Amino acid sequence: MNTKHDTAAEHHAAKRHWLNSHEAGYHKAMGNRQVQMIAIGGAIGTGLFLGAGARLQMAGPALALVYLVCGIFSFFILRALGELVLHRPSSGSFVSYAREFLGEKAAYVAGWMYFVNWAMTGIVDITAVALYMHYWGAFGDVPQWVFALGALAIVGTMNMIGVKWFAEMEFWFALVKVLAIIAFLVVGTIFLGSGKPLDGNATGFHLITDNGGFFPHGLLPALVLVQGVVFAFASIELVGTAAGECKDPESMVPKAINSVIWRIGLFYVGSVVLLVLLLPWTAYQAGQSPFVTFFSKLGVPYIGSVMNIVVLTAALSSLNSGLYSTGRILRSMSMGGSAPKFMSKMSRHHVPYAGILATLAVYVVGVFLNYLVPSQVFEIVLNVASLGIIASWGFIVVCQMRLRKAIKEGKAAKVSFRMPGAPFTSWLTLLFLFSVLVLMAFDYPNGTYTIGSIPLLAVLLVAGWFGVRKRVHAIHSTAPTLRK
């Protein structure tokens, strides 16, 4: 019995050794401040700056509770990822962990679903950059494609010349977003404490009770909003990919992850609570940033331009992150056979340039298609991409559960950074992700069509697997550390 147990442990150790060999070539150049900002930057997107106005209209003050619930489960997902990172840091992130604990088929599904997500998100980000630039009249005559290609050229170049440049750019992008929220929190808190009226209304908690209470439209609209709000945290998993190029992931990653939960609480929940204490929630409108609404009431000049800079930065940050992560994920998939062989190539700057160039090519094609296809079709495709995020988060949690099983069986060493409350919180998080899919199905028409597309996605993935399985089997049969 012991011999069989020892053989299983040795085989798993050999598999980890083979997976670690996939990390060869990367330059571990990221410092603590960069990893910290990548973690929080991934949790703050344009959803807070632009989308909060429409969501306040839909749910009122209850939006704060929705952000809190989604933030808690985002934290659980990050802690699950952190446990995996401490087990084995990898630039392949959850794709590499899926390969280790679930097999190559799971790595194939996880990787391509994640790529589809970033491909669609990136196209939207590039288009958004062009639209944000047109906000300023001076650029009104410049064609949108010029700004789109310009943004691609800048972000693509930074990603190609080295991880240090990506990390530095992402640090400053994230810092702009953080400083914008801090500025609102400081000014808003001071104004609230002064007791002065704003736009003819006294500030304070009575603005909630006098306008329908905490759930002005009832519980159901707030519940349905969960399926939209959860995607505001759609880049949190980036810290797992970055861990493979950190100077000291064992100390940096836990610090970065643990800081996310209180920052989500402060930035998301704190901002919404402050917004509804300063003005009636009915004062915020869809299509306008609630922060612009507040500062406009104060008479602050050029606030529209300032906020446009912030959302422009957020779009560039997302584009930057997408290129970085897809380059690493595609290389990890290629090493296992789930992606074309050329995508495993590295440059002399320690960058997986082939995967990045492939993503850039998709972005360029997508930008031009965006101007040709109907907007509703494009919106549905983007919603389908959201399934990639749910799938990625699901794989992270399942891999964490399999890691615990491997530790229990003596196949893997214990890690110091463990997901709190597991396995209960692991199952609860999976249930939450499933509930998001159910809520999406009730969001007619786009959400319903998105869930309805799952069988089609499954057929495409199965067809793709038949296209790569010969190479997958060849790689796995010849890897010396995997032969029993």
Name the predicted role of every residue range:
Residues M1-G53, Q57-A62, S74-R79, S91, ...:
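Membrane-interface "cap" regions at the ends of multi-pass membrane proteins
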Residues M30-F49, A151-I154, I208-V269, L274-L275, ...:
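Hydrophobic, membrane-embedded alpha-helices of multi-pass small-molecule transporters
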Residues S90, M113-A128, F233-C246, Y268, ...:
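Membrane-helix boundary/coupling elements in multi-pass transport proteins
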Residues Q144-A202, A234, I257-I261, L382-F395, ...:
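Membrane-interface loop-to-helix entry segments
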Residues M343-Y353, W393-Y444, P480-R483:
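C-terminal membrane-solvent junction of multi-pass transporters and transport-like membrane proteins
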